[in-house]
Structures are given as C-alpha cells and as structure tokens.
A protein has these predicted regions:
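An exposed, glycine/acidic-rich loop-and-rim segment of catalytic or binding clefts
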Residues: 1-165
Length: 165
C-alpha cells in the first residue's frame, strides 16, 4: 500500500503583474480545514462570516490583508468522483478568467506567502486540487491509501476564457 494524493502546484497571475491583489477569486465551498501552528489540520470549520468565505467572487487584496495570506484547504461540495466547480480566478483589468473543475474532494488555495527570489509574496497563487492533507494520520479526512491491484485516477480541468465568452 502507498499513500497517494497527486496535486498540481502551478502558479497563476492572470495579469502578469507583481501582485494578485487585484484578482478576484470564487471558491464555492462552505467549509475549510483549520490548522495548528505547524499547518497540521486540527478540524473543519464553516467559512461563513470569515475572510475565507469566497462563495461570492471576492477581490483578493482585502482577503490577503485580513488573513496574512491564504494557505488553506477547502472541502469542495458535490459528489466525489464527479467533476464540479473548484474555483474561478479572474482579473477584471484584463478580462482573463481561469475556471477550475475537479473530481477531487479538496482544493488547497495558496497565495504565494513564501515565494522567494526572483518572485515575491502574493505575486501569484496556486489552486491545488487534491485529497485532504494529513489524511494518512486522520482517517476522518477521507481515504488516501492505494492498495495493490487498485487504480488511482483524478481529473482536474483548467478552462481559460475572457470575460464575455
């Protein structure tokens, strides 16, 4: 047996600028993981009424200011194994839109809090569809073990458009 949770850690900045603060992010998730000081999940919380609530498209600048940066796993609603919306990242100034569809149960939203040279903090962000972090140590977070003879597959679609299309 082996633990498996493949994720794509590509970074996105739809404006090609020095900051994602003017981007908008929509994450249609009601819940996210809660972490301790070592970024180990300790539970699940609702996002309603918090800066982490992006069920309505929100400008990232105020969110980054309120949170100090995002590095959070959202629990995506919907039926496991079926494609569903994970996120929409957009840049109003250019009209560029990235839609993420996935069959994964979670999505880590990371705002580049620790980017180093030649990049800098919050210059881009990653939208990582995946299984739950630390699931091997916390079975309540869902399955993550692939046993001999089993098959693992996951699908994430990245759809690029411009506003109005």
């Amino acid at each position: 047996p082996t633990v498996i949770s493949m994720a794509n850690h590509a970074y996105w900045n739809l404006a090609g600028s020095d900051s994602i603060a003017d981007h908008e992010l929509h994450v249609p998730a009601v819940r996210k993981l809660v972490y301790d000081e070592f970024q180990i999940p300790t539970g699940i919380t609702d996002v309603e009424g918090t800066p982490y609530d992006m069920r309505v498209s929100s400008t990232l600048g105020p969110i980054l200011e309120a949170t100090g940066g995002l590095d959070d796993c959202y629990l995506l609603d919907g039926v496991g194994g079926q494609l569903r919306p994970g996120a929409v990242l957009s840049h109003p100034g250019t009209g560029r839109v990235l839609r993420v569809l996935t069959d994964a149960p979670g999505m880590q939203v990371y705002s580049g809090n620790n980017l180093g040279s030649p990049f800098h903090v919050h210059q881009s962000m990653s939208l990582e569809t995946q299984r739950m972090p630390d699931a091997p140590n916390q079975p309540a977070l869902g399955p993550c073990v692939l046993r001999p003879g089993e098959h693992y597959a996951t699908t994430t679609l990245l759809d690029f458009t411009t506003s109005g299309t």
